[in-house]
């Protein structure tokens, strides 16, 4: 019996030992991956990042970004790609479809938003060093995955090339430079293109092509690394896409600026008791924890204290009946293989000034209504431009490395001062280096005055502004009409009461980035010492 049992036990024991041995070999790797998911601080979706975060700069931690693609509402696609090898990375997000859905995406190389039914956005970014770049084409309503749907080039290529198309329009981008090229396109609902180029790529050129066969190209000037908060110095590229004219950034006289705060609402996410006010947990009656998901099934976002007809503080954008902060979120590393929800965390405090201080406001004219649009310093982004109430279909692109000295503005009859040249499809590229100087563009309501704060060229009664902060409109005679959305007032020695200047950085430094609270209206009142001389 013992002799007959021994072989049986030997067989069983051998199999058992083999199973244990295999388990011992496999489980540590699996456990290590699982544990690494939670022990690696770069993969913690609840962490709060900053522009100098090693997880974003590639100096330690986890430098691998996984792509995310998805669809939202009645037809939009989301795709992103990021480069490796250090430097800055980027992501792109397109928004469209049902009202209330908001899918922000930011990277320290570019920030892009697209709105409008049936639109799609594809982004490609690369690091400032020789990293990889790629793109994910998407079509309206599709949901390309993060594998098998890539196009473009990767690795340490010099001069990458990729093409993207959507159901309603086509954009082609090609770059050739001494470094890795990068770019993205944002086709909008009216087929107007808004391209984003990385100014840190010297000698980069871009080409815009529409389905009608019209093709224009322009060269981008390099920018210096000593420009504060510019993309060359590590700041973000912030641009907008969508129906800027006339449904975005509406401005009408007489109202005080309103700070809008996005408050999170929902029924709770995975592992969270249903009914809590925050999608990712938190105590009832308390502000929500750092936001880690923007998936609408886990709770959306709504505006507290603002509406589409209120003034917008610089850094806020309006889309589909809601107002959202730009640069409010920063994209963290999503865990590879995680569910199809990208990880987002609350960004660094606004007081750092990285997201807002480099956003001069470029007023535009559309019929009788005045609208404003944000155009950051040195982004090379494009704006809708041209005469008439509908604006031009072509890009209006002031490729400058500093504050734009010319505004892309024209009257309904087409102004000779219009950088784009009437309503043509050509991009506008104002001459010079784009240094901040006095300039004006004719329009039906008056002039655009660009003067630095405290400049000796500021005459009595004219607005004085901090460099890279504000642009004000005025009457035909040059008298200013400060734009309250910028928190600006006529200031300087020539103004009544000698009101000091306020910069966007000063204003937004006092706006808390999280929570349902509204900023004290006194934040927007002039403060500080009087400015009598430069």
Swiss-Prot record:
**Comp. bias intervals (Polar residues):** 454-472
Region forming the signal peptide: 1-32
* One Gene Ontology term of the molecular function aspect: protein homodimerization activity
UniProt xrefs under InterPro entries:
Corneodesmosin
Provide one Gene Ontology biological process annotation. Answer: skin morphogenesis
A cellular component term from Gene Ontology for this protein is: extracellular region
The region called Disordered is annotated at: 38-252, 396-497
Q: Which UniProt keywords apply?
A: Secreted, Signal
Q: Which cysteines are joined by disulfide bonds?
A: none
Keyword Secreted in the entry? The reply is yes
UniProt-annotated location(s): Secreted
Q: From start to end residue, where is composition biased (Low complexity)? A: 64-82, 107-185, 200-236, 397-415, 431-446
Organism domain of life: Eukaryota
Q: Which PANTHER family match?
A: CORNEODESMOSIN (PTHR23207:SF2)
**Function according to Swiss-Prot or TrEMBL:** Important for the epidermal barrier integrity.
Query: What protein am I looking at?
Result: Corneodesmosin
Species this protein is from: Macaca mulatta (Rhesus macaque)
Taxonomy of the source species? Eukaryota, Metazoa, Chordata, Craniata, Vertebrata
């Amino acid at each position: 019996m013992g002799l007959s049992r021994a072989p049986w036990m030997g067989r069983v024991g051998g199999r058992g030992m083999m199973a244990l041995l295999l388990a011992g070999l496999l489980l540590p790797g699996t456990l290590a991956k699982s544990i690494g998911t939670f022990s690696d601080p770069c993969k913690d979706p609840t962490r709060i990042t900053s522009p100098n975060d090693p997880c974003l700069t590639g100096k330690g931690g986890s430098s691998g970004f996984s792509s995310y693609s998805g669809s939202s509402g009645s037809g939009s696609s989301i795709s992103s790609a990021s480069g490796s090898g250090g430097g800055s990375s980027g992501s792109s997000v397109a928004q469209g479809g049902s009202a209330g859905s908001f899918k922000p995406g930011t990277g320290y190389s570019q920030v892009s938003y697209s709105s409008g039914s049936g639109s799609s956005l594809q982004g490609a970014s690369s690091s400032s060093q020789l990293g990889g770049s790629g793109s994910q084409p998407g079509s309206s309503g599709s949901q390309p995955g993060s594998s098998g749907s890539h196009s473009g080039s990767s690795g340490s290529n010099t001069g990458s090339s990729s093409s993207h198309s959507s159901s309603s329009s086509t954009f082609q981008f090609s770059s050739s430079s001494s470094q890795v090229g990068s770019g993205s396109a944002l086709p909008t609902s009216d087929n107007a293109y808004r391209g984003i180029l990385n100014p840190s790529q010297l000698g980069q050129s871009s080409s815009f092509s529409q389905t009608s066969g019209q093709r224009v190209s322009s060269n981008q000037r390099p920018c210096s690394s000593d420009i504060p908060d510019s993309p060359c110095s590590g700041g973000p590229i912030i641009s907008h896409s969508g129906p800027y004219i006339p449904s975005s950034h509406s401005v009408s006289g007489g109202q005080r600026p309103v700070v809008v705060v996005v408050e999170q609402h929902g029924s709770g996410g995975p592992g969270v008791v249903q009914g809590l006010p925050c999608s990712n947990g938190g105590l009832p009656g308390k502000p929500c924890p750092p936001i880690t998901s923007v998936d609408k099934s886990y709770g959306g976002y709504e505006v507290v204290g603002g509406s589409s007809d209120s003034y917008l503080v610089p850094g806020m954008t309006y889309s589909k009946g809601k107002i959202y902060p730009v640069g409010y979120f920063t994209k963290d590393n999503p865990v590879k293989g995680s569910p199809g929800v990208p990880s987002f965390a609350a960004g660094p405090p606004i007081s750092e000034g990285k997201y807002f201080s480099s956003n001069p406001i470029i007023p535009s004219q559309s019929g009788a209504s005045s609208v404003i649009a944000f155009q950051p310093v040195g982004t090379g982004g494009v704006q809708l431009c041209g005469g008439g109430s509908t604006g031009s279909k072509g890009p209006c692109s002031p490729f400058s490395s500093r504050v734009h000295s010319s505004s892309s503005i024209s009257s309904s009859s087409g102004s000779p001062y219009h950088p784009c040249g009437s309503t043509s499809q050509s991009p506008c590229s104002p001459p010079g280096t784009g240094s901040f100087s006095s300039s004006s563009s004719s329009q039906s309501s008056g002039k655009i005055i660009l003067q630095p704060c405290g400049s000796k060229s500021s005459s009595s009664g004219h607005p004085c502004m901090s460099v890279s902060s504000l642009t004000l409109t005025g009457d035909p005679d040059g008298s200013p009409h400060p734009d309250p959305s910028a928190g600006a007032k006529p200031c300087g020695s020539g103004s009544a009461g000698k009101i000091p200047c306020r910069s966007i950085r000063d204003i937004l430094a006092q706006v808390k980035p999280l929570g349902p609270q509204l900023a004290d209206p006194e934040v927007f009142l002039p403060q500080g010492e009087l400015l009598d001389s430069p």
